[in-house]
Curated annotation (Swiss-Prot):
GO terms for molecular function: aminopeptidase activity; serine-type endopeptidase activity. It comes from the Eukaryota. SUPFAM superfamilies: alpha/beta-Hydrolases, DPP6 N-terminal domain-like. It is an enzyme of class 3 (hydrolase). Coiled coil: none annotated. Keywords: Allergen, Aminopeptidase, Glycoprotein, Hydrolase, Protease, Secreted, Serine protease, Signal, Virulence. The active site is at S558, D641, H673. This is Dipeptidyl-peptidase 5. Belongs to the peptidase S9C family. Extracellular dipeptidyl-peptidase which removes N-terminal dipeptides sequentially from polypeptides having unsubstituted N-termini. Contributes to pathogenicity.
Amino acid sequence: MAAAKWLIASLAFASSGLAFTPEDFISAPRRGEAIPDPKGELAVFHVSKYNFDKKDRPSGWNLLNLKNGDINVLTTDSDVSEITWLGDGTKVVYINGTDSVKGGVGIWISDAKNFGNAYKAGSVNGAFSGLKLAKSGDKINFVGYGQSTTKGDLYNEAAAKEAVSSARIYDSLFVRHWDTYVGTQFNAVFSGTLTKSGDKYSFDGKLKNLVQPVKYAESPYPPFGGSGDYDLSSDGKTVAFMSKAPELPKANLTTSYIFLVPHDGSRVAEPINKRNGPRTPQGIEGASSSPVFSPDGKRIAYLQMAAKNYESDRRVIHIAEVGTNKPVQRIASNWDRSPEAVKWSSDGRTLYVTAEDHATGKLFTLPADARDNHKPAVVKHDGSVSSFYFIGSSKSVLISGNSLWSNALYQVATPDRPNRKLFYANEHDPELKGLGPNDIEPLWVDGARTKIHSWIVKPTGFDKNKVYPLAFLIHGGPQGSWGDNWSTRWNPRVWADQGYVVVAPNPTGSTGFGQKLTDDITNDWGGAPYKDLVKIWEHVHDHIKYIDTDNGIAAGASFGGFMVNWIQGQDLGRKFKALVSHDGTFVGSSKIGTDELFFIEHDFNGTFFEARQNYDRWDCSKPELVAKWSTPQLVVHNDFDFRLSVAEGVGLFNVLQEKGVPSRFLNFPDETHWVTKPENSLVWHQQVLGWVNKWSGINKSNPKSIKLSDCPIEVVDHEAHSYFDY
């Protein structure tokens, strides 16, 4: 009943100013990247929408007309997990998650103009995804990825034998990574071939593991690796994949290589950029990513960092010739931005890259032979770029993107021309109605060492003559940013439409503003970033009349959670009515319990046992800091967060309770560093927004705002009195 009551209240209040509710946010359609056909006439994309009444998320695939932006349904079959163009007109290959092989998938072939008339080409004996295709004579070679057994077979969970014991035994790191205990299975790229007979293709079920022959290699690399970690040459004969350096400790170093291997696996894969190798530029030992073959297959572009233990070092474009021993070339190596993806133009002369720049994911172009000091040119588009694909053989690309004001922006972008809008979700979806760029603006403030950027996000129906409490949202990372991006978890617009003006700062440590700002947080977590936040708060307090700082709140996750815990023990903590710390560190020395040791060993200038003073310097649990605690605080921490153990949140809550500080602990036993399940996300929003609304006064000024009591989950409260009542 509570959930139903809350839904009714939310809808009723929408006309009064709170237009965008958590339920709108969670149930709004989610669309994937749009992939154009070879001729550049149609694009296919995935769409899903959560239904709170039925507790399910049906999904399907749509077609986008690249001339007029019209959208038509291709299929509503939720079992179709991915679709890719065959390379022959409008014919497609798709993977169906249900198959006659238990635990396997089916490979099907159809035509986008007659999708129902499909036929099955064959089965894959296990979970398989990330298809990439290339014609090789009268055959079609493909690659994809799945889990590998130690013997190199595709792992099939449904067919696997149940272990006689639940014990795990380790002789090396990782023990666990992100949200999973590391097991004997690992990701691997597999190759196969579609053979043509008459007018149909068939697959014999035989796959070749291209990764397993390299001991300790893994590709795509978890937890976020996918099809961008490998590529297939246009003639279908050569595969490139990225793996962390097999010979180095993966938990301590970020070093990774780009491997080349024949599609048929006739030779063992070899790295082209091995550390201290004959082709590798001197001093380049960091993480590699985004391998992409040139159209003629003679060159391969990829991105690589220099530092061997720093996941946020600047990426530089590298180009290697295939089949030679010539040194790898660095392209535009002095460009002070960190590219994230790279692609070749159809003539192989121009590179298109995405990179974050001033809190926006932008698209750039540069010559494939650009010199070190070359500055790439920006291609005009709206919002931030998530992915892009060339439209036929033209210079134009189809961009799939998003922004702070829309969760899907499909547009055509061409160098030196205005962009052309195809479909913007906020103009189509009723859940996003009213959202737009007019409620977003940048703010620049003099920080501790340089000017610091923030986003200001205003509520629907904003009136500059009224006053709104401040919602001060601190991003994670710490080497991350509040970008002009749509977040499916921490969405500033959801907070704003409770009746706040959101200020989302990008303090020292943030990405996209030059490498120096990113690097300057090293061994200074509670130093310059905290001072930046103080200066931003002071500027808002002194100069922005429509923001009420006296009733403001602060919230953050991950590093943002740490910063909230740090703020609680500082003078700034007394400026807020309430705090929210999600998955933040509390005790300095507990950082050794994390998974990726390279992260803390870089950020604190040494190992836990050699540089202990650096870990202790920014310890939120210091007695002199805890003595200052008084601001009501909600603590959120989840059981499957293996980056920051749930004990961090429990310990923080223990101290808040014993101190008599009004506090609450929110825990999801089935969530990780993030809360992603729809029903859990709704409860998260009810609790987090209900908490800040209670203490900021929003509940009093707006009786239809979210309240803690709107959440249907019963609160555990075993004691009638606090510790200090006795």
